[in-house]
Swiss-Prot record:
Region (G1): 324-331
Annotated CDD domains: IF2_eIF5B (cd01887), IF2_mtIF2_II (cd03702), mtIF2_IVc (cd03692)
PROSITE patterns assigned: G_TR_2, IF2
Protein name according to UniProt: Translation initiation factor IF-2
Protein species of origin: Ruthia magnifica subsp. Calyptogena magnifica
Similarity comment: family membership: Belongs to the TRAFAC class translation factor GTPase superfamily. Classic translation factor GTPase family. IF-2 subfamily.
Length: 815
């Protein structure tokens, strides 16, 4: 049993603190009341106690008069100390120290004996455990040897069984005549049956020919096809895309069977159609085979593996994205930080492109990315969240948390990047910051002063209040997270924006994320590639190179890439062309697969859409990101009755080719921040093509909504204006059947729509042809008045029927 300081203090009749002090004086530190005391430490403790007891006996002498102690002082004088007499007897006082010393000695001896006994028990347990381990090891070795012997015996038995048929065959072969032995050895299975082996001119005897014929028949029967007893299960490796015929070959089945399974799954395909990996795996499992998803190593994968950055990483500036709802002051806040006036140059005062800038703050460089807040630019915000290190979520203090604020929070949480909330417009009156914090907390964005981990800083983009605190928070976050990247390597990055600019060509805004981008490098972005001809920073300065976290404009690509495409620098133009061609081929294959995936479904959809009105649109925008956002927004306007179809989209001005395509497809041409040239305008006038120009995205969307609303069928509603009950029916050769009625409710008007009800069931619906009061034709009859009603093209009216007079009202519908 291991002793602790607590148990030893009870044995020694001392406090735990005294025992700890004695151990510390003896050189054993770091003990507390629950610390275990080893045997060696117990010996040290006992030794210290013995020394203390002996020193006390030598220093003190007990007498009836008190305690005397003598010691030599520095001057050699003797000092005598007398203890005050106690009320107890002198005998008890003299015996007390001796009793204490004896008790200590006894306790020490007991503790030492207990320690020795514990050590002996531990040694005995260790010896017993070692003996058990040795026995287990011996038993395991014996068992292993027995298993090995059994396996050898089984193997010998199998060999004997395998040799037995061979011996029987050999015995049978030996019993045959010599001329018939070994006639079927080797590959000579087509030996002539009626010719002797050694003499071709001599025929075999009839008996020998019969035996040889039987042997050949047996041999042929052994090699004949036999139907499998159990179904053969294949393991099918399936790539990302596979043809139906190829899949059937891998499963060793007919292509028609595969088509039947596909049809049962609701997929209409032909033999040469390409299906995706998931569909193919379902088909394989449905047909009883095992499917394995195989990932082919493509040219692109090999290139990316080769370009993986390796080397010493160095600190880089943080990339900060500003996100939030439209008109919450994102660009205005960035303007104050940059001391610029960007919002003055934006149409409608809202951001419609991704802007990237670098700012110096207290000697530190920070890269800012400004994103649009309009709902149509959701993809832009998503791309920015994935390309950033820190997100500044701007929330207007007077407006609170809005839909795009919540959407931005979801993008940030999906990307897993740190977030700082800037509560803007605190210079306005009547704001409630705590309410904003409470609403944000419902979306798992909890302020630090509420026990969360998100810094929330009140700022004003108008007065500049709190901006310094916001910059300090960014610098602190960057210092804690230690953002770094490899500098000396081929550059990698992300396309932020791309456009076609007159006089400059294809201009691509990229964010360098690792490596160094140099002028003259071979760059690939999406489907486009080319040599870097010029690098320009956010201030318009031409650079020779760009390092990580720098946003730059690059000239030299073969086309305009899509926003969000990965940028790679390769060592040769041949490799760049090879990767670009591979990506284009893969994209064409995906588009073809998409078109051929369900032809029957498309056919049925077209039949259903025969009554659907369609607005064809040809869209041209200034940058690729805006074009993508507009396409998504326009297609989102489609309903069951009216839809928008973007027949073509692109970047750059509107040209003559666009007008020709619009005339052919009867499309409306929409230009976003672009204009048509003179030739295009003339062609549009001749062809009757309508061109609309826009600089604000929601104006474009509202106009398209208005056009679609004009295509919607009006909403019809019915208004009952009167009810009359039929009292009698008069027959007239000239007028036909006339119903004598009493108007019970409302007004009955001539030339109105009516319903004839019998027992509350509609039996006829038509027009009220004639209305008479006595012999006079009247236009209307009010409630409580008798009248005669003639119904157009209906002669089965009877007394007791009800005539319901109503009108239909058309209302124009809007989206």
């Amino acid at each position: 049993m291991a002793h602790t300081v607590q148990t030893l203090s009870k044995l020694l009749k001392k406090t735990p603190d005294e025992v700890i002090t004695i151990l510390a004086n003896a050189g054993v530190d770091g003990k507390n009341s629950d610390s275990a005391i080893s045997a060696e430490e117990r010996k040290i403790l006992m030794s210290s106690l013995s020394k203390r007891s002996s020193s006390k006996s030598s220093m003190f002498s007990f007498s009836k008069t008190g305690i005397k102690s003598s010691a030599n002082s520095a001057s050699g004088a003797k000092v005598q100390v007398k203890k005050k007499r106690l009320t107890k007897s002198a005998t008890a006082t003299d015996e007390q120290p001796e009793i204490a010393v004896n008790e200590v000695a006894q306790a020490v001896q007991v503790a030492l004996d207990a320690g020795r006994d514990a050590d002996k028990k531990l040694l005995a347990q260790d010896a017993k455990r070692l003996e058990m381990v040795r026995l287990q090891k011996t038993q395991a070795e014996v068992l292993k040897a027995q298993k090995k012997t059994v396996k050898q015996a089984q193997a010998q038995e199998i060999e004997k069984k395998a040799e037995k048929p061979k011996m029987i065959d050999k015995f049978k072969e030996d019993k045959k005549p010599k001329r018939l032995r070994n006639t079927l050895n080797g590959n000579n299975t087509r030996r002539q049956l009626h010719v002797a082996r050694h003499n071709p001119n001599r025929k075999l005897k009839k008996k020998d020919r019969t035996r040889l014929s039987q042997k050949v028949q047996e041999e042929q029967a052994q090699h004949a096809f036999q139907k499998p007893i159990e179904k053969v299960v294949h393991e099918i490796a399936i790539a990302e895309n596979i043809k139906v015929t190829e899949l059937a070959q891998k499963m060793a089945t007919k292509a028609g069977e595969v088509l039947k399974v596909l049809m049962g799954m609701g997929v209409m395909a032909t033999l040469n159609d390409v299906i995706d990996q998931d569909t193919a795996m379902l088909v394989v499992e449905e047909m009883g085979h095992k499917s394995i998803a195989s990932v082919e190593e493509t040219v692109e994968d090999v290139l990316i593996e080769q370009l993986k950055s390796s080397g010493n990483e160095k600190a880089r500036p943080p990339v900060v994205t500003i996100m939030g709802h439209v008109d919450h002051g994102k660009t205005s806040l960035l303007d104050y930080i940059r001391q610029a006036k960007v919002t003055h140059g934006e149409a409608g005062g809202i951001t419609q492109h991704i802007g990237a800038y670098q700012v110096q703050s207290n000697g530190n460089t920070i890269t800012f990315i400004d994103t649009p807040g309009h709902a149509a630019f959701s993809k832009m915000r998503s791309r920015s969240a994935n390309a950033t290190d820190i997100v500044i979520l701007v929330v207007a203090a007077d407006d609170g948390v809005m839909p795009q604020t919540i959407e931005s929070i979801k993008h940030v949480q999906t990307a897993g990047v740190p977030m700082i909330v800037a509560i803007n417009k605190i210079d306005k009156e009547g704001i409630d910051i705590d309410k904003i914090k409470q609403v944000l907390s419902t979306h798992n964005v909890i302020s630090e002063d509420w026990g969360g981990d998100v810094m929330m800083i009140p700022v004003s983009a108008y007065t500049g209040e709190g901006v310094d605190a916001l910059l300090d928070a960014i610098s602190l976050t960057a210092e804690v997270l230690e953002f770094s990247a490899v500098i000396k390597a081929l550059a990698r990055g992300t396309v932020l924006e791309a456009r076609l600019e007159k006089g400059r060509g294809k201009v691509t805004t990229i964010l360098v994320q690792s490596g160094t981008l140099n002028k003259g490098d071979i760059m690939i972005a999406g489907f486009e590639y080319g040599k870097v001809k010029q690098i320009v920073d956010d201030k318009g300065k031409v650079l020779k190179s760009a390092t990580p976290s720098m946003p730059v404009e690059v000239l030299g690509l073969s086309g305009v890439p899509n926003s969000g495409d990965e940028v790679l620098v390769v060592d040769s133009e041949r490799k760049a062309r090879e990767v670009a061609d591979f990506r284009k081929a893969k994209n064409r294959e995906a588009q073809l697969q998409k078109q051929q995936a369900s032809k029957m479904e498309n056919f049925l959809m077209k039949m259903e859409e025969s009554n659907v009105s369609t607005v064809n649109v040809l869209l041209k925008a200034d940058v690729r990101g805006s074009a993508q956002a507009l396409i998504e927004a326009l297609e989102g306007l489609s309903t069951d009755e009216a839809k928008v179809k973007v027949v073509s989209s692109g970047v750059g001005g509107i040209n003559n080719t666009d007008i020709t395509l619009a005339a052919t497809s009867n499309a409306l041409v929409l230009g976003f921040n672009v204009r048509a040239d003179a030739v295009a305008r003339k062609t549009a006038d001749n062809e009757g093509v309508r061109i609309e120009y826009y600089s604000i995205i929601y104006n474009l969307i509202d106009d398209v909504k208005t056009i679609m609303s004009g295509l919607l069928s009006p909403e019809l509603s019915e208004n009952i204006i009167g009810i009359a009950s039929v009292k009698s029916v008069f027959r007239s050769q000239k007028m036909g059947d006339i119903a004598g009625c009493m108007v019970e409710e409302g007004v009955v008007r001539r030339d109105s729509l009516i319903r004839v009800l019998r027992d509350s069931v509609v039996i006829f619906e038509g027009w009220l042809e004639s209305l008479r009061r006595f012999k006079d034709n009247v236009n209307e009859v009010k409630s409580g008045t008798e009248c005669g009603i003639g119904v157009l093209n209906y002669t089965d009216i009877q007394p007791g029927d009800q005539i319901e007079v109503f009108e239909r009202i058309e209302r124009i519908r809007t989206l």
